[in-house]
Amino acid sequence: MAYDVLIVGGGPGGYVAAIRAAQLGLKTGVVEREHLGGICLNWGCIPTKALLRSAEIYDYAKHASDYGLAIHGELGFDSKALTIRSRKIAAQLNSGVGFLLKKNKVDVIWGEATIVNPGEIRVAPPKKPPVQPQDPIPKGVLGEGSYQATNIII
């Protein structure tokens, strides 16, 4: 399949560049091996901020009397529930990236890219399967194979 632009990596730089290229009328694809949105969205900044927000709420509850409030009973936390909430927030944002790419008619090609010649990428199955929060890859999507592009962005 031939593209005007192929972008290797669906992180914050890759997916934004892909959307803009598509908006400018270029046939665009993104090769992603693991999860759209990159490390920050899926495993770093966003999940960490969700955990910090839970800690902040816990701290407010511990100091409820400072606000003229009373909490009866023991205050505690559930680390599993905190993690589930954090992952859920990341998954929601991850699916938003997928929606934006689809809305802008950007093809997502699942796999690991290798540039084999100028203007040609070979995509192989990822060394490790996609991990949550990425939804399972639907049947019929682009993946393993050879792709040509006028421009390749890494």
How should these model regions be labeled?
Residues G14:
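N-terminal Rossmann-fold NAD(P) dinucleotide-binding loop
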Residues M1-G11:
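Beta1/beta-strand and adjacent pyrophosphate-binding region of the FAD-binding site
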